């Protein structure tokens, strides 16, 4: 029987099913016309042989027919052109329903991004996932698409089924927008719970039985505690920007929320980096998670060239300006895009166009999809104070600069990053925390103004350049205190360390770690300009003072380098090649500078043969103090003898090393002389002896007696059958140094996350997750020092209570507002999880939920009527009506008015007072 052809056909090329989805849809954006294919010849029906007389013949015919059909289908798909051909691994191959595919096409997604292609199939298999992806990589759709596919439609049973936690209000709004757009073909209800909105409105949302809850951790925990929510119905949980969640201090809230979730949930965690605290959280809250990380982000590109410059602390600003001016050739003044925008603005002022027309002209001048220019450079600084200082200094130098750091307002940060992406600025000064989620598609240069404290942070920084086959450069400023970290990086990368010009100009910047200094004259000119600016501009000088204080705190809190690198760095920094001019500078002026440095080194290394006492006596000709001269000569002779002995010992060690090297060459050098290369005049007894002759003649001596005895004593108690070493038997140093995730299927999350864990230093000196807080403050009320924990965990000094998980939460979360809201709405018990929902309840409480648009119901005080406007009396009447509505809504008497309708308590009180008056009036008079 011949080999059966593969079925179904290989998904090398797939047909576009968009036309099938949009057959009766007039809003389709598919411009490819539908062409009718020619009818294919169908095989004649085969006669069925129930007795099994010719089963083999039928099987062979079926196999031949299937193979022919597959071959023709593949041939036709290969000949198709345009948008009708989809590569394998598209959204159609993921098993999504037709409504969701239709929404994806309307959204504009044609091909899944790499993180979507890797993540969605794993999520569809009901596995917990830890995904590492930057902002802009499509990670929002990577977890929203499987969530909509799993939830499918609105459930008639009470209880939310999907939960998405975001660190900020803006990100939550963005996620809600994506959920609304991708869930258009379904009746799923989604709500947004963020701080700043009305609690009463959010009570109504949660009582309306939503399917998907998108919230910030603080507000969601507040509602959970206030409403006593049961989260046992949650099936799908997403922690979006998880590293940002921990940095913003939501660790306690996340722990409390996680404690209330069911164990059968599916948990997804997306982050740009993977700090140690996040790894511990994932191990505790996720069940056998799968780590998904793009391989291109885990290693340095082979097209990236690195240059390291040794510099003093006082010359760092001048060195930065020298790199921008002389190395990168950064132009000053406005960029080309900015000039184009100014021209478009000038043209729009001259022409009488509408506002819409002006906006279109500005969009033409600034193309949002335009990639950064060849001069685009990111400068990494240690703290936000350094960012402010460098931004002001570079602006003073005439460069077009943008900046970003962690505590910058979200809107301002977006504006600054967009200016850099569109080419309005050439330089972006950022911290590691702020740059974590920034995705720049094409970048030319990276400058490490402050050297990173971990090798993985260096890889994370320089990984933004040299992408898609393009060349890129990274320039790093290394002080003497940063030398241990440089050596750690050199060992981590496994590359050769080249100091100065010790190897000449034969260096490879892509494969070597090349360290050198700057030309002194050019560097001095830039340093003098910086000094002059600091003297003239007091604002920049004050910013530098603040940055210096912030640097002291940063130096105390950054990770320590390895002990071996710290020891080795002393000899590296003390060598003459540490400050030699970098091989990157190879012009005529540089050569003159090199010769001058050599001359200064010779002068600095000069040691006279006589002391000053001997020189003075020789000049005068009359020895004044012969005893002192004899003492000096005797000391010199002693020192000379010691020096000669030291030189002799050093020479002997060199000879021993040389002899050992010769033995190694004799054993392993393929270029060594063999027996066949011996000349004819040399006797045969000079040829190499065999191993058996050497064993018989000489005793093997490989180690000292003490080492041998130690080894024997160690092996004496080791039983190879039961002995278990503390080191793994299959240790591979090359694999330990690898950048990417360990090979395999990443089934072991602990092992897979070990190579990608990276802690970023916070840019404000704030403490991270699980770091102890020792600072205290004086409590005036209790007359004692108390911890600042209560001031910074969201409670603002209020009383704390223990939650269900044992974590501290603010006591204000249990304020009774939900009970008061239910009483005002005249509601009884809400349905429990699993019970049938009350449709009238959800429709009456929140009309905005589940609609096409999300509406905020926020009460604002009316603006005061302006007497100078024509509509003064109209506005005044409207304001008075609004005040009356507010007074009646507030409860009448509480707002200053009297309520005309009495409730049961008022009636009962009035009856009691009336009865007292009757009893009082019915008493007999005291008069006799």
Curated annotation (Swiss-Prot):
Protein name: ATP-dependent RNA helicase dbp10
Organism: Aspergillus terreus (strain NIH 2624 / FGSC A1156)
Domain called Helicase ATP-binding: residue spans: 120-292
Function, as annotated: ATP-binding RNA helicase involved in the biogenesis of 60S ribosomal subunits and is required for the normal formation of 25S and 5.8S rRNAs.
Reactions catalysed according to its record: ATP + H2O = ADP + phosphate + H(+)
Any one GO molecular-function label of the UniProt entry: RNA helicase activity
EC numbers: 3.6.4.13
GO-annotated cellular components: cytosol; nucleolus
Xref: Pfam families: DBP10CT, DEAD, Helicase_C
Record-linked InterPro entries: DBP10_C, DDX54/DBP10_DEAD-box_helicase, DEAD/DEAH_box_helicase_dom, DEAD_box_RNA_helicase, Helicase_ATP-bd, Helicase_C-like, P-loop_NTPase, RNA-helicase_DEAD-box_CS
């Amino acid at each position: 029987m011949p080999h059966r052809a593969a079925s179904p056909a290989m998904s090398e090329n797939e047909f576009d099913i968009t036309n099938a989805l949009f057959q009766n849809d007039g809003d389709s954006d598919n411009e490819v016309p539908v062409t009718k294919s020619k009818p294919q010849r169908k095989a004649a029906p085969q006669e069925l042989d129930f007795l099994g007389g010719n089963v083999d013949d039928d099987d062979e015919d079926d196999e031949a027919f299937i193979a022919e059909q597959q071959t023709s289908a593949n041939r036709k798909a290969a000949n198709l052109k345009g948008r009708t051909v989809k590569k394998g691994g598209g959204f159609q191959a993921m098993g999504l329903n037709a409504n969701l595919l239709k929404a994806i096409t309307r959204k504009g997604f044609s091909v899944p991004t790499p993180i979507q292609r890797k993540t969605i199939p794993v999520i569809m298999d009901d596995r917990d996932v830890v995904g590492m992806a930057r902002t802009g990589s499509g990670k929002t759709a990577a977890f929203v698409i499987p969530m909509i596919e799993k939830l499918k439609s609105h459930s008639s049973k009470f209880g939310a089924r999907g939960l998405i936690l975001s660190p900020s209000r803006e990100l939550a709004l963005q996620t809600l927008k994506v959920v609304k757009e991708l869930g258009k073909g379904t009746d799923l209800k989604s709500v947004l719970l963020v701080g700043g909105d009305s609690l009463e409105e959010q009570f109504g949302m949660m009582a309306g039985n939503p399917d998907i809850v998108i919230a910030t951790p603080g507000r969601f925990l507040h509602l959970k505690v206030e409403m006593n929510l049961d989260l046992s119905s949650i099936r799908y949980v997403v922690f979006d920007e998880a590293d940002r969640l921990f940095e913003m201090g939501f660790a306690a809230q996340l722990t409390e929320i996680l404690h209330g979730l069911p164990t059968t949930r599916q948990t997804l965690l997306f982050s740009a980096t993977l700090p140690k605290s996040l790894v511990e959280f994932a191990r505790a809250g996720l069940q056998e998670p799968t780590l998904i990380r793009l391989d291109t982000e885990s290693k340095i590109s082979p097209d990236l060239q690195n240059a390291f410059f040794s510099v003093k602390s006082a010359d760092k600003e001048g060195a930065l300006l020298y790199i921008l001016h002389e190395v990168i050739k950064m132009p000053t003044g406005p960029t080309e895009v900015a000039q184009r925008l100014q021209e478009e603005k000038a043209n729009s002022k001259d022409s009488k166009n509408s506002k819409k027309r002006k906006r279109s002209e500005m969009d033409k001048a600034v193309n949002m999809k335009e990639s950064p220019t060849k001069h685009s450079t990111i400068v990494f600084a240690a703290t936000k104070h350094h960012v402010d200082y460098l931004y002001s200094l570079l602006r003073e130098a005439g460069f077009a600069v943008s900046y970003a750091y962690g505590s910058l307002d979200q809107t301002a940060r977006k504006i600054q990053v967009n200016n850099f992406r569109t080419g309005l600025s050439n330089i972006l000064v950022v911290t590691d925390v702020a740059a974590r989620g920034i995705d720049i598609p094409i970048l030319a240069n990276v400058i490490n103004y402050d050297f990173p404290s971990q090798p993985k942070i260096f890889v994370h920084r320089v990984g933004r350049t040299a992408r898609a086959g393009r060349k890129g450069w990274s320039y790093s400023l290394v002080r003497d205190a940063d030398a241990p970290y440089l050596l750690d990086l050199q060992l981590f990368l496994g590359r050769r360390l080249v100091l100065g010009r010790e190897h000449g100009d034969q260096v490879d910047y892509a494969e070597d770690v090349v360290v050198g200094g700057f030309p002194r004259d050019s560097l001095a000119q830039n340093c003098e300009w910086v000094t002059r600016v600091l003297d003239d501009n007091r604002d920049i000088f004050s910013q530098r003072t603040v940055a210096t204080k912030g640097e002291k705190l940063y130096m105390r809190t950054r990770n320590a380098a390895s002990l071996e690198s710290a020891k080795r760095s002393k000899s590296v920094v003390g060598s003459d090649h540490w400050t030699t001019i970098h091989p990157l500078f190879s012009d005529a002026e540089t050569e003159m500078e090199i010769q001058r440095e050599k001359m200064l080194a010779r002068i600095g290394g000069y040691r006279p043969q006589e002391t000053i006492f001997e020189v003075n006596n020789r000049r005068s000709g009359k020895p004044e103090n012969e005893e002192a001269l004899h003492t000096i000569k005797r000391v010199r002779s002693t020192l000379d003898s010691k020096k000669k002995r030291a030189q002799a010992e050093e020479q002997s060690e060199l000879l021993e090393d040389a002899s050992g090297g010769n033995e190694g060459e004799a054993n392993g050098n393929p270029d060594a002389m063999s027996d066949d290369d011996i000349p004819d005049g040399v006797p045969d007894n000079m040829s190499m002896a065999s191993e058996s002759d050497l064993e018989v003649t000489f005793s093997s001596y490989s180690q000292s007696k003490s080492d041998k005895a130690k080894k024997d004593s160690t092996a004496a108690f080791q039983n190879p059958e039961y002995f278990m070493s503390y080191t793994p038997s299959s240790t591979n140093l090359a694999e330990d140094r690898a950048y990417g995730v360990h090979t395999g299927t990443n089934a072991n999350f602990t092992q897979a996350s070990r190579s990608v864990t990276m802690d970023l230093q916070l840019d404000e000196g704030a403490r991270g997750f699980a770091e102890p807080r020792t600072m205290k403050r004086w409590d005036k009320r209790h007359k004692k020092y108390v911890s600042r924990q209560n001031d910074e965990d969201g409670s603002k000094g209020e009383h704390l209570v223990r939650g269900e998980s044992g974590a501290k939460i603010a006591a204000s979360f249990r304020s009774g507002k939900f009970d008061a809201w239910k009483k005002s709405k005249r509601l009884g018990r809400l349905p429990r999880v699993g019970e049938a929902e009350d449709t009238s309840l959800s429709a009456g409480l929140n009309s905005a939920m589940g609609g096409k648009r999300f509406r905020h119901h926020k009460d604002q005080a009316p603006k005061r009527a302006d007497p100078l406007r024509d509509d003064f009396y109209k506005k005044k009447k409207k304001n008075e009506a609004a005040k009356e509505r507010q007074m009646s809504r507030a409860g009448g008497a509480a707002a200053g008015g009297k309520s005309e309708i009495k409730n049961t308590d008022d009636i009962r009180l009035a009856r009691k007072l009336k009865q007292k008056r009757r009893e009082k009036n019915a008493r007999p008079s005291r008069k006799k």
